[in-house]
Amino acid sequence: MPHNNDKKRTNVSRACDQCRRKKIKCDRNQERNICTSCQRNGERCKFERVPLKRGPSKGAHKASDPELKLSSNKPSKSSLFEDSNSIIRPKSVGEDSNMDPLSRHGSNTPILDNNSNSGINDRNMGGIDDRLGGSTDPGTPSRSGSILLPPLGQYPQQQNYTNNSTSASNNMLNSTSLNSTILQQQQPFWKVPYHEFQNQRRGSIESLQSDLSVRTFNPQDQLVYNTFQQSPIAMKHSSDPTNSIPPNTKSQHLTTTSNIGSVVGANDLLSGNPNYWGSVRAGSFIPNGDENDDQIPQNLQRRSSSIPSILRNTSTSILLSQPQLPHPTNGAGSTSNNFNNTNDNSNLINNKGTGSTAGLGNNIDNAVGSASPQAQRQSQQLYSYSQFLNQSKPYNNQNFSSFGQFSTNGFQSRHGSITSEAMSPSTALGYNQNNSNNLPGANNPNISDISLLPNKESDPRVNDSQKVVKTEVSNDIFQFGEQNLANTIESNADKSEDKVKSGGKKGGKVPRKRKTKQVKESNKKLKVNKKSNFDSDSINSPKVPTPVQQIKTGFQYGQILDVELIDLYYEFIHVGFPVIPLNKQTLTNDILLVNTHPYSNIHEVNSYVILWFRNSLELLVRVALKRKNDSPFFDSHNTPGPLRSASGDENMAFNDTPKKKDITSSHADSISSGDDNGMAEVQSAFISALNECFQRVVDIHPKVRENKDRISPKIKIIYLTTFILLNYILALVGYDNSFVLGMSVTIFNEFKLYKLLVLPYKAICQDSEFSFNAKQSISLDDDFIENKNIGNGNGNRTNGSTPGEPNNDEGENALTNFNPSKEQQNSQKGGSGEGNENQGNQIRSKIGKAVNIEEETETNENYTIMFKRLYILLTMFDSLQSCLFGGPKLLNVCITNTTEKFFSGTTNSKWNIEDSLVREKGALISLKLGETLSEIASNRIIMNHFDIITLTNNNQANATDIVFNLKKLSNNRDYDNFLQENKGLELFDQQPLCISQLFHKMLIMKSSFTYQLLSLMDANNGNFVNMDLKRLEQIVESLCSLISVILQLLTLIMRLNPTNSIDLNYRPVTPTQRMEDMLSNKNTDSTDSISNSNKTNSGNDFYRRLLGLEHSNDIVYSDISRGVISPFAMAILHESHNIHELIKMTPTILIRVVMTLNVQDDTGNSVNNNATPGDHEEDMKLKRANTSQDLVYKLSNSMNDVVQIASLLSMIKPLKLFDHGFKTFESEDVLQGNDEDAKKRQRPVLKRLFYDTTNVPKPEAVDPLVVSLVNTGWNLLDDMELGFLPQ
């Protein structure tokens, strides 16, 4: 540390660092630059240790400071504000009992800058002095230089609206400047109180370790308050409460006689009042008599947080960086509020101040139809998803987040608190010393009341007075966050330039004249985008991040509008695999409409769950977005706004960047070119974002489990769906993270969801885990409850009904939409009048009982279908991970045929997974593929028979089991049964609908071909069977079909989405009415034309089909999957490569086998020589010759397809962040032969496990071609058993 020259000690006068550490004498002098000890030990004789401070503390010289003497000579309390340098940290008598321990042990006293309070004069100090109470509390001694901050009921009032009174506005401005000054000094030492509604903090999710989060407030505590707070109690003590209220809202500004709180009118929000949240942030207490058990007055209660460190960063640090939607209020012109302290299942909107409520959906248009246009726009923003289809999407206009009502800007109980939950009391906060009016967006009502601090490294406009104080935050805050990747890339060049220009000094100021070209261009962009960045409604300005953005993770959420997130999901993701197994209308108008208002007892749990569901969905969308060549992965989204679909510069996509290459272009090029460093950065950013998102969801689980009986089933569905989204991301990028999957399985099992699949319906109704009992559930007949529209054999909705529309033939929901007269008419049409009438009476009596069931109970019963679907989806992802990486399954519940039962055609169309019938079929086919993968993973031989493998005397039985399991899997007609039960899907057998359909068929054909090859060897004795023409014909047919399906699959991928990413310029086609009619068997005449137009071989029309050239009159169903991403893309690519590598030489081998059989037949040694004397031998020979010729022709075409498959595999590059590479197989040249050692090395794994060559007799004469085919079968079995990816 620096010292004066006269006081600086020479190195000779003290021991060197090494001698001091060893506590020996140092003999270094001016003649010798090294001491004897260091010279002998070969150590460096250095003096780098900073000498300890000696002498008395600074406090002993306090009286010698003239400025402090000046302050101490004035005993009056108004003298506290004469000089800012005289402000010191106060201590009260009761500090040891009431103060925070961290604040009691502060050592240094911060001194304010002289410039921070230069505008404060004596007159203003008098106004502040009046607010402080006018007299000193007897319990607090008046000492020199201390700050007596007001108690809870007397903190300064917030500046509300326009300056209607000069004195009121001046006092408020001075109060703002003073408290800003006090905040800069005192914040690290004070436990800042925050206020909330009565006793609502006791259920906070932030007190996971303890619910005792409410502490009694001591009036003697010295507190610091945010200048943006507004208290209804402070309004009482102000001289004229109406001065700060505009004239048009005076009639609506109501203050209760008990001074509990004030009700903010609807016009406050519509007029752009930035203090609309004041009643929430300042702690306006809502009457709640249920939990008002404390004897202490509510205005004397103080809330303290016992937040775990990992959750401190959750509710504010990452939340503050996202836009916020204003709190829902009453309709336009209404001033009354109806509060409900129970956990409602849907948000309700009050109609013009009356007590009636109206559901959100189509009725909301009527509720706001008579209001002004501004009120209508605001009403559309009150609720998140009820107006999804009608919400406007301005580019640089209002950018309210639809999830804003879920406290995306932090829990509403934290509003108004200076100290963030992400910071400890001893952590300094970077606070802007300028007036709040100078902050960007300070007068913008749509931006949260938080200072937007410019980044001094990325924003050249920042001067010295605006530099942010660097803080040391606990490691657990950065546990799952890294520095912003984009900011790091942009600031690296600036940092390097700063070091060079400042002579290597860190933080040196760069001269204005020596700015680089990049910095000038950055300034130019800032000037151009100044209006859009600062005047827009988005809090996420790319160049002016919040303080939280400077210290938090590199993945910044909230950069895509919530409406766009839902639209993008249902357009590009849902058809490929319904990770959210529900249609868009039900999701937006029912599931996501939950109670997240602050007066709810568990509103923070609801807000937290929905927030991270939204963030998980954004993470999925941004990872899947197609990356341009000049943009670095998903962190290149620098411009908030809607995603554009049209082409052109003005309609540039969301993740597009300007054409001019900037500093980040080299980084983007390195990533796109496969540079290891660039890919490592991308992987690091992705893993950080995924771990953070997953950790936040897991952190809330104890609170969800604790309140599982009070939490709405909607919240449970959203919470569990978040885990499905994260596992989808893992499958999409090919990331093997067993921790995410394992924890997801654990949480699903804690919800006991497996009982819904394994227990009978009546047992489920009586299980307390699902809130059912004997009175709540009416057990109808099993066939009535489990009635699916697929029961009539067609699997289609009657009359093509869609969710939300009544079904005219059968009741969509027998519990609510039952029509006795309609059923009586149906029973009369049945012919058997008496039997139908009795049956109708029985059903009518049961439904009559069910009508009296409460709505919540009925909803819980209907939600069980969602829990079943989510558990099935998790099982599918578990199976996919097992097939990819070869690990064991974690969930062993059988899900065979669950797609038809729980996903296809439920009784209530509200719960269908898709509105469109064609798109629904595409999703069902993907789910059917998940069933097949689950069956493959569950029936893996190496997992089920590992206990028998070690028995050497039972090898032949094991081989028999292998053949049996292969035969069972190859004969699995489940896919064909699925096509037969769902009439209309036979159209897709001729024309594939999606890639999942062809991949499903490829897996089944692979199993069949493997069985055909292994059947050439007798499992009992290990001998090879003789090859005949009939057996050879079966093998050739199986091989050609497999190769044809692989080529068709890869061709379809090339046409639909070769990169498996979301391209906004390549969108799916909306299904036409003709497609819907044909699929619902209304127009079966054109079925033949579709099938005939698509009967093309894979050889000649390859390039035509690759380019997607079809006749204009043909219906191309696969266009609905164009641009759609799939979680199976990684598995498809690697499995296709593995099969291609294993069978690429098989057509050549089979051609030689065919030719060998013909030669044997000509010489009379043919195996098939059982012709009767009456048969014509010439005709038989001719028939065999024709068969052989056909086989050779098919095999020749297959060889051509193999070449095309190799070309396509090199062209298809799906999105993957982790390059696992492809499996390598050693080719066995059967024509030239290999030595015995090479053959042993090439021996398949399962063959070595199940066969011991010493015990198996070797056949005398073995055809090497047949041996090669059998070894190919074993290799295919290894691929199925050990995983698609290399281990």
UniProtKB/Swiss-Prot annotation:
Regions of compositional bias (Polar residues) in chain numbering: 105-121, 240-255, 295-308, 352-365, 412-431, 665-675
Entries under InterPro entries matching the protein: Carb_Metab_Trans_Reg, Zn2-C6_fun-type_DNA-bd_sf, Zn2Cys6_DnaBD
Classification via SUPFAM superfamilies: Zn2/Cys6 DNA-binding domain
Low complexity composition-biased segments: 69-79, 329-351, 370-379, 432-446, 789-800, 821-842
BP terms from Gene Ontology: glucose metabolic process
Locations listed in the record: Nucleus; Cytoplasm
Skewed-composition ranges (Basic and acidic residues): 456-467, 492-501
Listed Pfam families: Zn_clus
Biased composition (Basic residues): 502-517
GO terms assigned for molecular function: DNA-binding transcription activator activity, RNA polymerase II-specific; DNA-binding transcription repressor activity, RNA polymerase II-specific; RNA polymerase II cis-regulatory region sequence-specific DNA binding; zinc ion binding
UniProt keyword annotations, A-Z: Activator, Cytoplasm, DNA-binding, Metal-binding, Nucleus, Repressor, Transcription, Transcription regulation, Zinc
Statement: the UniProt record of this protein carries the keyword Cytoplasm: yes
DNA-binding region listed in the record: 16-45
Keyword Acetylation: no
Annotated Gene Ontology cellular component terms: cytoplasm; nucleus
Region called Disordered, residue ranges: 49-152, 235-255, 288-308, 321-379, 412-467, 489-541, 636-675, 789-849
The family this protein is said to belong to: Belongs to the EDS1/RGT1 family.
Annotated function: Glucose-responsive transcription factor that regulates expression of several glucose transporter (HXT) genes in response to glucose. In the absence of glucose, it functions as a transcriptional repressor, whereas high concentrations of glucose cause it to function as a transcriptional activator. In cells growing on low levels of glucose, has a neutral role, neither repressing nor activating transcription.
Protein name per UniProt: Glucose transport transcription regulator RGT1
Gene designation: RGT1
